[in-house]
């Protein structure tokens, strides 16, 4: 009996790890699918409208960030996870329907609805998967969480690559149905995870209730700065590769790549950014015991600012080679140097969430749980900043739009250097 329970728990752990990967998988569908939407004649190449799916995905965090935490208390870990998985399946299915419902604007509206529903799922999954792994994993829970984080980064790497390969050459005839295999994979993983968790017995941990009044974390000035920093960070993290994907895919106003390979190249280059985030997290895990969060955040913020400004002022004619899938195989392809510089920012952004969180909750005590819910709501920055950036890209060009990223990084640097000092507002 004990062995059967252990095997069931291990299967549930695997399901949770796959769901951590699905968080990144579903989130990173938005930018490459945005390339397809941009080609709709009615959208006329608008980067801002192409980024609307990403916006809807992250908008859900502002609505669901704090309630998702309350669901854990009200419904328990298992029921919350099952609800999140079911909502995720529905969200991806609605996105699939957008490829078959007809022409613009109906297909566009249905797609945005699907992205919004998926955002609710991803928000709930972000809230429940790590506590579930901690509960199911026992003494090995931290190891499982680290494996899940690595799988999350791997999915972030593969998603734009896979979507880019499926789209092939971007034309006015490109449609969301071109990426149906990716949507089928997502629905399959959600369905399998739901079935597994449905039949695995999971007991919720005992909740320690307290009558002690918990002070609002917003009374701490450094936490307020940290909330702003998290909002900007998620926007920076998403905006750098998302806009880079648009830039490389755009053969006319962007990087000037061969149209027959531009989208595939863009997917692989953007995917490399997420791969470097994985590398950065691994490096950070080794040095975090010796290098403080303040020092790490200060250094990576400064380096990221230098890389982005360098990329902005690097001529398109200055090129370098990066590996990419061209349709017939993997090759070294020529891309603007700016693309490589922006990809390297993945090493910098990889450690920002953890270090900002660590500095922002310093000295909060019992208010830390409330702080976590506020942070989850601030993930909406991943939708707002990229939308603003691509609105500017439509008006002034791709590279000038990265001033939005520089501004965000500048505030994060301020937070690391001065704003993180523990002090009540």
Q: Language-model segments: what does each one mean?
A:
Residues 105-125, 323-352:
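Hydrophobic core of transmembrane alpha-helices in multi-pass small-molecule transporters
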Residues 11-43, 130, 240-248:
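Extracytoplasmic
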Residues 124-138, 349-365:
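Intracellular juxtamembrane helix-capping segments at the cytosolic ends
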Residues 139-140, 144-202:
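Helix-loop-helix hairpin linking two adjacent transmembrane segments in secondary transporters
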Residues 30-31, 159, 219-275:
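Extracytoplasmic gate region of multi-pass secondary transporters
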Residues 51-72, 271-283, 381:
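Central cavity-lining transmembrane alpha-helices of secondary-active solute carriers
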Residues 63-109:
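Conserved MFS/SLC helix-loop-helix module at the cytosolic interface between two early adjacent transmembrane helices
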Residues 86-105, 302-331:
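C-terminal ends and interior cores of transmembrane alpha-helices
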